């Protein structure tokens, strides 16, 4: 996102010396989000460990006008990453994690990897089911590693954030605090740091579910916060819709 041409164009659209009202539209309002009670937003999360649960969530995804989607993997390198699990959200606070490849002593029984992906394939590859994510290009690469093509990509909150407020941080933790007043679970909190860090496939499933479902939930909530901001600025909305999203 550090493209000089894009930054120059964005400054021209926003104006080099914005007035107070333009500055407000560029992101000042998000700084004042009231801090929410820790964990209060996570009460409706599920961990999908049986086929009945998965079928129920497939019905929710099929009916949702827009669903947030995220992957948990073995690597930050999308070309090397292998899928560990997927998370979904269909409404604020209504999210789930589907663990598929956690590996540690005493791990609960997980759904069969290939069979679960086969069930998800029609939704993942459906252009008529609108999906959003945070840095979806990464998730698209991960799915491609497993022979799946993500279709129906409608929105990306990281791209929207960059267009709306190019001078701010665009990681989910920062955005959640800035726009929603929510302190999220950090990756280091579930995997550890330094030499003691473990792979996500070694994270306890219930802890992983809390983290992963939150990712999808926060993505959906951020979309709700950022979309009106884009709508206020037709030129920025056009930049997001016509330039940024199509090149994903």
Where do the language-model regions lie?
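Glycine-biased, low-complexity coil/linker segments
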Residues: 23-25, 31
């Amino acid at each position: 996102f550090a493209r000089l041409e894009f930054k120059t164009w964005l400054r021209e659209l926003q104006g080099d010396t914005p007035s107070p009202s333009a500055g407000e539209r560029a992101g000042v309002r998000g700084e004042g989000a009231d801090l929410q009670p820790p964990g209060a937003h996570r009460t409706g999360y599920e961990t999908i460990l049986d086929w009945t649960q998965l079928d129920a969530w497939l019905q929710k995804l099929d009916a949702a006008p827009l669903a947030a989607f995220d992957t948990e993997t073995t690597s930050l390198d999308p070309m090397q990453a292998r899928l560990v699990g997927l998370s979904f959200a269909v409404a604020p606070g209504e999210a789930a994690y589907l663990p598929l490849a956690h590996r540690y002593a005493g791990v609960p029984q997980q759904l069969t990897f290939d069979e679960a992906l086969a069930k998800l394939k029609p939704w993942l590859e459906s252009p008529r089911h609108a999906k959003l994510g945070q840095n979806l290009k990464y998730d698209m690469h991960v799915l491609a590693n497993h022979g799946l093509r993500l279709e129906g990509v409608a929105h990306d909150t990281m791209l929207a954030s960059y267009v709306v407020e190019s001078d701010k941080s665009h990681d989910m933790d920062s955005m959640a605090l800035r726009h929603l007043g929510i302190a999220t679970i950090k990756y280091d909190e579930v995997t550890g740091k330094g030499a003691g860090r473990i792979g996500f496939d070694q994270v306890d499933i219930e802890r992983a579910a809390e983290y992963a479902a939150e990712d999808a939930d926060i993505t959906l909530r951020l979309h709700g916060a950022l979309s009106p901001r884009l709508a206020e600025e037709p030129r920025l909305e056009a930049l997001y819709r016509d330039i940024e999203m199509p090149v994903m």
